Amino acid sequence: MITRLPFDPDKLVAAMLYVASRVGDPTKFKIGKIIFLGDFVHIAKYGRAIVGGRYCALPNGPVPSEVLDLLNGLITGDVAPEFWGTGIETKLQVSGDPYPTFLPKAKPDMSTLSESDIEILDKVIAEFGQWNFHKLVEFTHSLPAYMKAAEREPDSRNPAMDYEDFFEGNSYVVPGTKQELLENYALSRAFPEQTLAV
C-alpha cells in the first residue's frame, strides 16, 4: 500500500500556478481536483506522479493534502514551513469569500515541470477544467481509488488513498507503469534524502 509519495514544494507550486492560470475558476476545489486528476492520469501513463504527496478521500472527492494545506495556509496567512522558500505568498493572490479564488501573480517555474507533466496537465485541464463542482464530485466519487479508501477507513474523516488503486478502472493505464511506480517508490524509501522522479 502506497499512501504517500515524495513531493517537491517548488514543483507543487509550479503545478498550482500552471493550473490556476488555465482554468476559469481557480478555486481551492478546482485546483485540487485538476492536480489530483493530473496525478491520476500521469501515474497510469508514465508510472510516476506529477505532484505526489498524500491523497485523502474527503466528502467532496479526492484531495491532495499538500495542496489543501497550502491553499488553506494562503487563506489564513499561515503557510506551512515546507513552502516558505517557494515564494508562494507573492505568486498566488487570494480573492473573494466564502469560496476564494487563487489568482496567479507570477508565471510558473516551467523548469520544474517535465514535458510529460505539462502534457498531462494540459490534457486534464482540457477534459475536466470546465466541469462544475457537482460533475467533478460525481466523477471522482466513482473512481475505485476513492471508494476503496472510504471502505478501508469507514470511520475516518480523511481516509488515505492508495496510489496502487489509481490503476484500477483507469482508462489511461499503460502496461508496465504500475511496476514502474512500485520500483520508484521502493527507491524513494531506500534513498529518502534524494528527490526522485516518482
Please tell me what each predicted stretch does.
Residues M1-V198:
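Domain-edge interaction signal
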